[in-house]
Amino acid sequence: MKSLHLTDVREFPFVQAPLQRAITDGYDLLIELNAVKERGGELTPVGKELARLPLDARLARMLQAAAENQALAEVLIIASAISIQDPRERPLDAQDKAAAAHKKFADEKSDFLSLIKLWNWTQDAIANKESNRLLEQKFRQNYLSVKRLREWRDVYRQLKELTQEMGWRLNTAPATYEQLHKALLSGLLGNIGMKDVQADY
């Protein structure tokens, strides 16, 4: 609404007005993402750019920060992954087998890097497939949902097209751990937690 220069959301004549709490939460999120400076305030340059992306504001902010931090190639993979249901399947009757199969994708430092490992593994499998039937069989043997992997690729393709329309370029060199996580945190500030490594007795 801000980007369209419409009246303040609190005064707009909605058929069914949103709850005041929802409006407050929305403004708080935009402030967190640096899209506005204050509740009811005008869009910042960051906010104006985010308004051009028909995406969840958090995802849009991650992608924008990734373009600035030379991490867009990696964040496209992660943003599309967290937009769908996890493709890793964990059937109740085969949880140990699924965990063992998924171990090859695990990264000790970051769950986000695990998603990149999984993406690279699936892309390699697709590039070297002998047939679609054998490829799908390989995915199922590794407890991966064929349907969700397809959704992941579709969302990735859509996000990549959007970023190209924005004029953002993919980084040619792999992003560092710091570049990647700095970009991701731009959209996840409200989700940060602190781990206390000292046991409390």
Predicted ranges, named:
Residues 1-201:
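Second RecA-like catalytic domain
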